[in-house]
């Protein structure tokens, strides 16, 4: 998938790569933070010993720095986007040409996944969309009782689909 970067993005990526030695695949930013998606296996170099590279980058850019390790495996990439929050399950459903990712989390972690006014989930959709063609990420809050309650063949249980739509509707209000 081709990513369009503006001049500011290119300069920011170049500077971060020089500071850390990590290969950056993509970067996005907002008023609060800068997110760098680094090549699989480069997360250690990006963080640096004792988090030194992240601290230096935070000082240099004047914003909080988030790092995400890229993965060709979409489910692993989604887990990496939300790390360190542990996702109980991730599954993908294709609707026509659109990929929709569903993530199941413990009910207590739902707010952390979605973020204040949906910022975290919006950022995740933006990054997953740019790099993996994901159109939407839906959060399903529920406890996983056993390994067999995961939808078969990436099918979505009706109750899970309904609750994930309700979660997004609640957050958009």
Swiss-Prot record:
Subcellular location: Cytoplasm
UniProt-annotated stretches for the region Disordered: 147-173
Signal peptide: none
Job of this protein: Participates in transcription termination.
Provenance organism: Methanococcus vannielii (strain ATCC 35089 / DSM 1224 / JCM 13029 / OCM 148 / SB)
Coiled coil: none
Main location as per UniProt: cytoplasm
Organism superkingdom: Archaea
Official protein name in the record: Probable transcription termination protein NusA
One of the protein's GO biological processes: transcription antitermination
Cited InterPro entries: KH_dom (IPR004087), KH_dom-like_a/b (IPR015946), KH_dom_NusA-like (IPR025249), KH_sf_prok-type (IPR009019), NusA_arc (IPR010212), NusA_bac (IPR030842)
Example GO molecular function: RNA binding
UniProt cross-references to Gene3D superfamilies, sorted A to Z: 3.30.300.20
Listed HAMAP family: NusA_A (MF_00945_A)
UniProt domain KH: residue ranges: 31-97
